[in-house]
Every structure is written in structure tokens, then in C-alpha cells.
Amino acid sequence: MLNDTIVAISSPIGTGAIGVVRISGDHVKNIIDQALKRKKYTPKKMYYGWLYDKEGEKVDEITWVYHSQPHSYTGEDMLEIFCHGGKLITYAVLNTIIKYGARQALPGEFTKRAVLNGKMDLIKAEAVNNVITSETEISLKASFNQLKNAVSEKIKDIKNSLLNISAQIEVEMDYPDDIEFEDHDLKNKLVHIVNSMNQLLKEAENGIIAVEGVRTVIVGKPNSGKSTLLNALLRKDRAIVTDIPGTTRDTIEENLNINGIYIRLIDTAGIRYTEDTLERVGIERTINSIKNSHLILFVLDGTTPFTQEDELIYNKLNELGDKTVIIILNKSDSPNFTENNYLSLKQKNPNDFVIISAKNGAIKNLENKIYEKFFEKVNIEEPTLTNQRQKITLESSKEFVLNAINSLEKGFSNDIIMYDVRKALEKIYELSGENYTEELLDKIFSTFCVGK
């Protein structure tokens, strides 16, 4: 559908000084001619005038800029109209343009066209969305590093290396009697590619955390103060707080900013043995949330001894191994609070143990501990991958390169080695967007705002 013309409001909806309406496609010049009554104009120059409807009535007093293809964001003819801010007048401009033959753009469709027209690759397109949706300066920094094409250039280098190897093998296959390359030379080139991939993958998880947030799960036995802690961290009442164990039967998700670190916080059902069907479903969701988390906040009730339920959770968390766990002794405000029941646990985990009062909001030491655990991970200086799609696709490409090295070492024929090199290339093309499916693009751009 790239031959049609699209339009969308690109500014936030609501009262403001200026509204922005963006148009892209083959019909842009006709719209300028008919709706703006302008015959001569220069690209990249701002003009003042009126927008007219099809009956010749003035819709709004505007300024506008024309961008000629291919020197525009989408690579197509584009028109950007700057009208008076406000919901009614901005929608009036939008509807006027639609009556001149444009259609309402889909989410992310302008950027999707930019990718399809070769103005940017898929990695940069995802970075555009990340920059817009960044919640913290750290996530903005990681996203902006991608926006500057640094990651794309590294992927391009990997692609070119694979293309050169593919060409080298193909020449040898076409002229086996005349040309024969040394196996160790080919292996060294493949190993160099794997090393380049490893360099990107090494910081990938931290890049994902920086942009998408630290997936943080609050766990503990029922009535240990998990929901109170959630509310304290958010500085608002989000979860129901009662003295009845098992009140939280579903996961509650919220986002917050702790000293510049983006936290995706999940309050979960308390873990215990129960016959209650709904509560058991909640506990299953808790376990799934734990498996997918980066950080686990294990809440203990400081007014009670360390129970079998606490021990069950503690042992389960230890089995995970690679998770960051902070043990939180809660309810320090209570006259029944005592640290004595948990001294052994504190001695085993001296750097991961904090005492708080969630009820009174005395949680600064917990926030400092979270910052201490994750600041170095997310404060990334080097450009890196920033989502699971990018990471998984590059890992898949790397597996094919490793297969090619293995085939080479075992003395397999060139056509077998070539198969893996080509499959590795296919994954690199998928990563950059040179090889795509509509399903992939729809999934990526559906998360964009309309007008971008």
C-alpha cells in the first residue's frame, strides 16, 4: 500500500500552541495545489498561508513545509502542516486532508515506509520508538546510541564479512581445479565474525534492561507486606492492603524511576500451599513472573519468625542462581519487630539484606540498594542491542556461523559450509530489515504511536 497517501496527527492530542499534521505519499503535491492553493514552492522552506476545504472555506491559518522524495523522513513526498493547537482544530485539519484523498496512517506507518524505502534499517527504526518512549535518561542514552547508527554499522560490517566469505566459497565451488583457499584462512574469518557477534551480545541483556526496564518482582508469603511495599515505592495506593492473607490473587504491574533507573514493578500473589483455586492461579503467575524477572524483592515479616513458607520461597530463589535477589525485612515500625529471627539469613546475604518499614514509607535504603545493583549494568557507554528480537536474531545468526566452523573443522564439503553461511546472512538481513515478513513489521510497528 505504499502507493497511497497517508496522514496523521504527529503532535500530542490536547490543548497546545501548535498542532502538527503529517502527510506522506504520491498525492502530496496535489494536496498542496488544492488545499493550500500554492503552485510554486521550494523543499525544506517554511510557508505561511491558509488551509482550505473542498468547498473553498478556510479551515485554519497555518505554516507548512514540503519535503521532496527521496530527501524526506519516509523517502516519499511529505508535507508537514503546523496548525493552531487544540483537539478540535487539529482534527479539522486531519479530516480536511482525508477528504482530499489521504487515509489515516496506521501506528508507526511513517517509520515503516522509511524502512521499506531504505531510509533507515529496522534497528534504527526501533531506536526511534525507544527514544520517544524512554522513561529515564539512561534508557534515552541507550536508545540514542542506536539512533546514531553505531549498532547498525557493526551489523553492516558482519554482513559484509559474511558476504565476502560467501563469495570466496562460491568461487572455489565454481572453479575447484583453479582456485583453492586455505581452510585455516576461512576459519579465521568465521571466528572473527563470531567474536564481533559476541561483542554485541555481551552487553545485550544490559541494553535491554536499560531500555525496557528492570523487570522486578515482589515475592513473599501472604501478608508479609508486599502490596504495602508496592504502594510505598510508587508513592500512591495501587494495591489493596488488608490483614487478610491471600488478598492479592493476580499480578499488578507498574513502572517507576529509581534514581534514573527504569523499574517495571510487579506485585504478585503470596506463595503458600492453598486449596483456593483462584489463589493457586495467582501463585502460578507469580512463579512465571519470577522466571522472567531481573530483580526479585523477597519480603519477610519482621514481626514473625522465619517460617516454612519463607524457607520454601528462599530455597526456590536460590535454585534460580542467575537472578539478583534483595532480601527485605519489613515492618520495622511495629513494636513486635525483631531482627533476631533473621540474623542467620543476614549473615549469609550481608550485601543483599535491608530492613524497611513499607507502611511508613521508610524505604530509602532499599531504593539505594536497587540503584547499587543495577547502575553499572544500565549505564552503558557502548552502543548495544536493546530488545529481545535483536538479541535472539543475532544469536541465531551466530549459531549458523558456529555450524559453518564445525563443518569446516570436520572437512565437510563447501556446499554444506555455504548453507550455514547463507542462513547466517538471512538472519542478519532479518535483523536489519533487509529480509522481512509482513507479520514481523506489523508486530514491530504496532507498538509505535500514530504519526511516527
Swiss-Prot record:
Localisation per UniProt entry: Cytoplasm
Pfam families: MMR_HSR1 (PF01926), MnmE_helical (PF12631), TrmE_N (PF10396)
Chief site of localization: cytoplasm
Residues the entry annotates as binding GTP: 223-228, 242-248, 267-270
Record domain TrmE-type G: where: 213-375
Biological process according to GO: tRNA methylation; tRNA wobble uridine modification
Transmembrane residue ranges: none
EC number: 3.6.-.-
Matches recorded under SUPFAM superfamilies: P-loop containing nucleoside triphosphate hydrolases
Binding positions ((6S)-5-formyl-5,6,7,8-tetrahydrofolate): R22, E80, K119, K452
Binding residues for K(+): N223, T242, I244, T247
The keyword Glycosyltransferase appears for this protein: no
Statement: the UniProt record of this protein carries the keyword tRNA processing: yes
Binding site for Mg(2+): S227, T248
Comment on bound cofactor: Binds 1 potassium ion per subunit.
A GO term from the CC aspect: cytosol
UniProt superkingdom: Bacteria
Gene Ontology molecular functions: GTP binding; GTPase activity; metal ion binding
Family: Belongs to the TRAFAC class TrmE-Era-EngA-EngB-Septin-like GTPase superfamily. TrmE GTPase family.
Subunit structure: Homodimer. Heterotetramer of two MnmE and two MnmG subunits.
General function of this protein: Exhibits a very high intrinsic GTPase hydrolysis rate. Involved in the addition of a carboxymethylaminomethyl (cmnm) group at the wobble position (U34) of certain tRNAs, forming tRNA-cmnm(5)s(2)U34.
Protein name, per record: tRNA modification GTPase MnmE
The species this protein was found in: Petrotoga mobilis (strain DSM 10674 / SJ95)
Gene name for this UniProt entry: mnmE
